[in-house]
UniProtKB/Swiss-Prot annotation:
Family that this chain belongs to: Belongs to the AIR synthase family.
Presence of the UniProt keyword Ligase in the record: yes
Signal peptide location: none
NCBIfam families, per the entry: purM
EC number annotated for this UniProt entry: 6.3.3.1
Catalytic activity reported: 2-formamido-N(1)-(5-O-phospho-beta-D-ribosyl)acetamidine + ATP = 5-amino-1-(5-phospho-beta-D-ribosyl)imidazole + ADP + phosphate + H(+)
Transmembrane stretches, start-end: none
Name of the molecule in the record: Phosphoribosylformylglycinamidine cyclo-ligase
Name of the gene encoding the protein in the UniProt record: purM
Lineage, broadest ranks: Bacteria, Pseudomonadati, Pseudomonadota, Betaproteobacteria, Neisseriales
Pathway(s): Purine metabolism; IMP biosynthesis via de novo pathway; 5-amino-1-(5-phospho-D-ribosyl)imidazole from N(2)-formyl-N(1)-(5-phospho-D-ribosyl)glycinamide: step 2/2
UniProt source species: Neisseria gonorrhoeae (strain ATCC 700825 / FA 1090)
Length: 344
């Protein structure tokens, strides 16, 4: 008679999954909003739309962290990639004026390492807490043979809400409007395949002091900045015509996503100083300037477009919220089929 097999024999530890759920419950609980009905662990999560909305529109977004995870594996640094995961989605839905309501995560691995997964999800909860977004659930998938030992993949899903009349579409953007840029916290979560290639080729001392007391390793792995609270506060006071979250495609490819087809964002390359991380990447990788602008955020994580008469006040307000804000340039009429972002 053959030996009796269990799920554990096949490589799946149900007890480990249960242990993880118990460990992360306190972190998730800190993120809860009054709109959330019920506790973590049900088959579905219930969220009601607040009564303050007359005609609410739900805005959804999903994203991952990309190959930045490879550095997390190599450097055994797992406590901030969860922040990256949240930021990539909530910053995206913020662009349309949405207040993030809730977030779900997907964590997949070959064998569940409970302490490591706890670090990751603790970071997710921190990102949710910092953006006022409830972590209402997720999926932990342990799939033997699907991932190398010690590796995992992440996906995040955010849903927010905005009053229909307040949805930011970019349609009102016109010549003469001002382009503001909010500083990034590093490379955020994009361009890491190139970053890893540069590190591999240049073989730098990752633990030597690099910038303002930070090592190069710390500068490279720094988490994506969350812009939710300062931008939502600004929207209470000012009209923002358009925003662009600077992610994959860099400055040149993301700004046009919010511009009317007959306009161009004319950006002055000298309006902000390229942060040291990007200076190093460009030099060590011999990366052409235009390639830098279409691969990395180059120090600008969020672009905000406002009327000229509001520019100084918005800049001052966001600075007061703790953001470093640059006046990058202006919107002008487009000539023929020229690219809609011109950096010069």
């Amino acid at each position: 008679m053959s030996t009796s097999l269990s799920y554990r024999d096949a490589g799946v530890g149900i007890d480990a999954g249960d242990q993880l759920v118990e460990k992360i419950k306190p972190f998730a609980k800190r993120t809860m909003r009054p709109e959330v009905l019920g506790d973590l662990g049900g088959f579905g999560a219930l969220v009601e739309i607040g009564k303050k909305y007359q005609n609410p529109v739900l805005v959804s977004g999903t994203d991952g962290v990309g190959t930045k995870l490879k550095l997390a594996f190599d450097w055994d640094k797992h406590d901030t990639v969860g922040i990256d995961l949240v930021a990539m989605s909530v910053n995206d839905i913020l662009v349309q004026g949405a207040e993030p309501l809730f977030f779900l995560d997907y964590f997949a691995c070959g064998k569940l390492d409970v302490p490591r997964a706890t670090d990751v999800i603790k970071g997710i909860a921190q990102g949710c807490e910092e953006s006022g977004c409830a972590l209402i659930g997720g999926e932990t998938a342990e799939m033997p043979g699907m991932y190398p030992v010690g590796e995992y993949d992440l996906a995040g899903f955010a849903v927010g809400v905005v009053e229909k009349e307040n949805v930011i579409t970019g349609l009102s953007i016109g010549a003469g409007d001002v382009v503001l840029g909010l500083a990034s916290n590093g490379a955020h979560s994009n361009g890491y395949s190139l970053i890893r290639k540069i590190i591999e080729r240049d073989n730098p001392d990752l633990d030597a002091e690099f910038d303002n007391g930070k090592t190069l390793r710390e500068a490279v792995i720094a988490p994506t900045r969350l812009y939710v609270k300062p931008i939502l506060a600004a929207l209470e006071k000012f009209t923002i015509k358009g925003m662009a979250h600077i992610t994959g495609g860099g400055i040149t490819e993301n700004v046009p996503r919010v511009l009317p087809k007959n306009t161009v964002a004319q950006i002055d390359a000298e309006s902000w100083e390229l942060p040291k991380l990007f200076q190093w990447l460009q030099k060590a990788g011999n990366v052409e300037t235009q390639e830098m602008y279409r691969t990395f955020n180059c120090g600008i994580g969020m672009v905000v477009i406002v009327a000229a008469e509001d520019a100084d006040a918005v800049r001052s307000f966001l600075s007061g919220q703790g953001e470093t804000v640059y006046r990058l340039g202006c919107i002008r009429e487009r000539q023929g089929n020229e690219h809609q972002t011109q950096v010069a």
